[in-house]
């Protein structure tokens, strides 16, 4: 019997990468899974688009664990669609215990060259999308009256001044503000809220064209920002999922309002 047996987890951005890994890991720990993804292009996003086939593969892998899964193509910028999915999840599974706000996009450029549309797109997905996920799910956790765990996927860029991704860095810092404020609001309901801060995860987001070239060109002045304390350059999504699974479980029942770096110590630099 897994440590999440009998629980239900709601995960955004789960068609591939970290989101898929989180879905599989929480299912392996015994949770039934609700997983969404936009499954298509997002304006201004430089990461390869996810597809409906990607989301279907996530569902297949979750089912292989023996757990139930509900999937839907949803854009986190669409609050009503997220609310509809949360309502349907409650109707199908009867409960909701864990929320993982994972959906995100990435683009790069020098701050003074970003267009308003590029800024808005990243902020709308990476910050407003987190708010929408909370708005759609937290009322169910409160009404259920059995506590819960809300896990917000931020980034090492949410804890330091990462250059060339000002919109992304601003959004991920904003997620920290959401985490800390929401943790105080939900404490009376025994609902915990924490943020996770990955760095260097081997997903499509690491393959954004041009970003690493720009970083290398500025290595003399900005290189230390990207240096790790531990002797590694990248990690697997499953390494982040281990922290997500821990925060979702009763093993972390007294932890709330925390920022958890999983980043080789880069934020310690």
Regions found by a protein language model. Name each.
Residues 110-111, 118-123, 225:
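Substrate-binding pocket helix/loop in short-chain dehydrogenase/reductase
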Residues 43-50, 188, 200-229, 239:
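A glycine/serine/threonine-rich, flexible loop-to-helix segment
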Residues 160, 231, 245, 256-269:
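Short C-terminal tail/terminal secondary-structure segment
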Residues 155:
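Residue(s) in the substrate-gating loop at a strand-loop-helix junction
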Residues 2-93, 107, 211:
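Short-chain dehydrogenase/reductase
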Residues 187, 192, 255-257:
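Short, small/polar-rich loop/turn modules that mediate ligand/substrate recognition or access, typified
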Residues 134, 171, 179:
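Active-site helix of classical SDR
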């Amino acid at each position: 019997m897994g440590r999440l047996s009998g629980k239900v987890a709601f995960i955004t951005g789960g068609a591939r990468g970290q989101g898929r890994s989180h879905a599989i890991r929480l299912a392996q720990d015994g949770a039934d899974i609700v997983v969404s993804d936009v499954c298509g292009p997002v304006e201004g996003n430089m990461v390869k688009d996810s597809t409906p086939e990607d989301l279907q593969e996530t569902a297949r892998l979750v089912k292989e664990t023996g757990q139930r899964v509900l999937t839907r193509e949803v854009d986190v910028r669409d609050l009503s669609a997220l609310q509809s999915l949360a309502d349907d999840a409650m109707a199908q599974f009867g409960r909701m215990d864990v929320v993982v706000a994972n959906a995100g996009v990435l683009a790069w450029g020098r701050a003074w060259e970003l267009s308003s549309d590029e800024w808005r797109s990243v902020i709308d997905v990476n910050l407003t999308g987190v708010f929408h996920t909370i708005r759609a799910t937290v009322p169910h956790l409160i009404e259920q009256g059995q506590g819960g765990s809300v896990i917000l996927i931020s980034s090492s860029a949410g804890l330091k001044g990462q250059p060339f991704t000002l919109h992304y860095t601003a959004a991920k810092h904003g997620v920290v503000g959401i985490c800390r404020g929401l943790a105080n609001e939900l404490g009376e309901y025994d609902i915990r809220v924490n943020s996770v801060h990955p760095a260097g995860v081997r997903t499509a987001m690491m393959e954004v064209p041009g970003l690493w070239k720009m970083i290398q060109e500025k290595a003399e002045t900005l290189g230390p920002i990207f240096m790790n304390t531990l002797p590694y350059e990248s990690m697997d999504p499953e390494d982040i999922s281990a922290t997500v699974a821990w925060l979702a479980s009763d093993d972390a029942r007294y932890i709330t309002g925390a920022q958890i770096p999983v980043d080789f110590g880069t934020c310690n630099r």
